[in-house]
């Protein structure tokens, strides 16, 4: 909404209608001593052309994946976004509308969310999906709270290498709710050990969490982890990358009770870290504990199909202590991006994206491993992301490659670990991959 300043004449007319001589008469409750007595230190008045030039100048100091070749990953990935998505999402019915509190008035919005839910159920091989959570981290935290509520237990075990940011969000949720802290399983070769998990598991465990692929990009033994979790009556919670499911087994196929994920790779831009999209799916027997919004299909009195918000267990609708979650909204626009993305690609399309990402990442990993001084930190199978040990600090590699207009990856020293986390998507060409290897080999 544009800001159009009031003229002196506008101000006089408004004060006259209100029966006030000055603006100060409208704010008598604000003590005189804390009122601002001087003019704000603002830019001088500018024309539209001048404002546009100023903002473009400020924006030009930023860099983006449109201008640089990106190997950044660690939770946000540079996948191709078909231009049709923006065209459809930008329709005023979608872009400006917020689902009203009488939600059934917005049948188009509800149907779009319903289609998104249906796609997530198919992708994750689960029975029910909600309308989305804030992002992958909050979806995982809500999944753990749900597991605690369902089982009546308190302990939570992370079976493999979980994204550090997810760990922090999970810790915040659990501490605020007075629940037990998260226990980390031992790692070997970048993945969780089954012996370590078996030693940690007791009948006090509410949930066993695994990220697939994990933070390092490596593949965990999810089937064995799920069997161990269920052997002690714990719920098996999987945080699965949605693009990986074009190649890897879906969580529902290996026994996940709750499957969540970060939906950013599904047609959503990296956008400096958000807004993103939390995917949340469950098996049928847990549907009444699912948090967030849930859109269902029904029949109206004329027998026509209609869409409604169903099982409304949010604190907006019932007593707070009875609510399944205090998240009272959803990422509808981001979910729409994901639904359109998957609809445009189709089943074979998401397989192609996953295959290209995997093949190109393995090609790059093999080439980097042949550079003197560079090596792969882990030998475990991976999907599109891997950790490289470098002959110099990872931050130096990143700094040097920026001069070549390349985002070389994520510096793991941020998380008190050594290595460079490199991610490859279907966007990368062989020429770009070969150039990256050449530049790495030339570093001194």
From Swiss-Prot:
<dbReference type="GO" id="GO:0009116">
    <property type="term" value="P:nucleoside metabolic process"/>
</dbReference>
<dbReference type="Pfam" id="PF02347">
    <property type="entry name" value="GDC-P"/>
</dbReference>
<dbReference type="GO" id="GO:0004375">
    <property type="term" value="F:glycine dehydrogenase (decarboxylating) activity"/>
</dbReference>
<keyword id="KW-0560">Oxidoreductase</keyword>
<comment type="function">
    <text>The glycine cleavage system catalyzes the degradation of glycine. The P protein binds the alpha-amino group of glycine through its pyridoxal phosphate cofactor; CO(2) is released and the remaining methylamine moiety is then transferred to the lipoamide cofactor of the H protein.</text>
</comment>
<comment type="subunit">
    <text>The glycine cleavage system is composed of four proteins: P, T, L and H. In this organism, the P 'protein' is a heterodimer of two subunits.</text>
</comment>
<dbReference type="InterPro" id="IPR049315">
    <property type="entry name" value="GDC-P_N"/>
</dbReference>
<dbReference type="InterPro" id="IPR015422">
    <property type="entry name" value="PyrdxlP-dep_Trfase_small"/>
</dbReference>
<protein>
    <recommendedName>
        <fullName>Probable glycine dehydrogenase (decarboxylating) subunit 1</fullName>
        <ecNumber>1.4.4.2</ecNumber>
    </recommendedName>
</protein>
<comment type="similarity">
    <text>Belongs to the GcvP family. N-terminal subunit subfamily.</text>
</comment>
<dbReference type="InterPro" id="IPR020581">
    <property type="entry name" value="GDC_P"/>
</dbReference>
<dbReference type="InterPro" id="IPR015424">
    <property type="entry name" value="PyrdxlP-dep_Trfase"/>
</dbReference>
<dbReference type="InterPro" id="IPR015421">
    <property type="entry name" value="PyrdxlP-dep_Trfase_major"/>
</dbReference>
<dbReference type="GO" id="GO:0019464">
    <property type="term" value="P:glycine decarboxylation via glycine cleavage system"/>
</dbReference>
<dbReference type="InterPro" id="IPR023010">
    <property type="entry name" value="GcvPA"/>
</dbReference>
